[in-house]
Amino acid sequence: MSEEETQALVVDNGSGMVKAGVAGDDAPRCVFPSIVGRPKMPGVMVGMDQKDCYVGDEAQSKRGILTLKYPIEHGIVTNWEDMEKIWHHTFYNELRVAPEEHPVLLTEAPMNPKVNRERMTQIMFETFNVPAMYVNIQAVLSLYASGRTTGIVLDSGDGVSHTVPIYEGYAIPHAIMRLDLAGRDLTDFLMKILHDRGYSFTTTAEREIVRDIKEKLCYIALDYEEEMKKSQESSELEKTYELPDGHVITVGSERFRCPEALFQPGFLGKEAVGIGETTFQSIMKCDLDIRKDLYANIVLSGGTTMYPGIGERMTKELTSLAPSTMKIKVVAPPERKYSVWIGGSILSSLSTFQQMWITKEEYDESGPSIVHRKCF
């Protein structure tokens, strides 16, 4: 087989977006929402060639007549039937490849239940007949993408955030911390505080508008109290946003109050500590000897780490928590929105990785549990 034919496919399944493409590329070829929509009233649209299910952007655009479901909640697959639909859509409609001709690298959330890894493996080999596959933890791939093998990754996406300490390429399981606070919660919170200002956003369509406002206008304050004072005394922090219908709204302190919830989950009524302190706790659960290496390699990853100001604020928070002599370095790679996918693309193109794949033969011999022996 020629090089082109045996290229691996890399699929990063997030709670909010699926990122998929071909190993060796520097960015995913397709990025679409992890949504499956089914008609609310099947068979009402007579004469329309109505499908029984829609995936991704098409589901998003027809959301008026559909019931939308997210098969991945908080990073973990909860609905396998819909997940299969998403993978089918990824291979056949988005990438337009035959999965039976390519090895497939999938990503998983840290602390993914064992049965889930087995189920992923089973579906790949039995439903899609892939020749080989591998499952890797998302945060580990992000670290590879930054050119490191040791460090701590703060991975925050749409459904969940994790801090994952990694030493010499292996995640340290007992020190992984999970925070059920991510992009979707921040969008909801922004909807709420904009509502307090008199702008009402309620429908799923309007929610998408709020997500866009969040992505375009929000930032993280270095000092929240100072920023609040500044926003009350002058209007220099105010920005305008034009809604699809032409109305213009003004957004002020909401710009930094929304993502501040990452550092103060109390804003959302959550008991948890913020991402700065969670990172600190995660490091403290690791062996004394490697903490220095972790403090000097704090890598941000995922769409919810895209706020301007997040690197400086993380540095400030950790400096106040860590021993005073400790060198702290927070790395915020510009491509961090896709760094999980990029890490997968790098890893699956390495010649040394080729012996790591779980092959069809191995699967037929051992069954789904092979995944625990080969992917750790």
Curated annotation (Swiss-Prot):
Function, in words: Actins are highly conserved proteins that are involved in various types of cell motility and are ubiquitously expressed in all eukaryotic cells.
An example Gene Ontology CC term for this record: cytoskeleton
Enzyme class: hydrolase
Organism: Cryptosporidium parvum
Keywords, alphabetical: ATP-binding, Cytoplasm, Cytoskeleton, Hydrolase, Nucleotide-binding
EC annotation from Swiss-Prot or TrEMBL: 3.6.4.-
Name this polypeptide is given: Actin
Entry's family note: Belongs to the actin family.
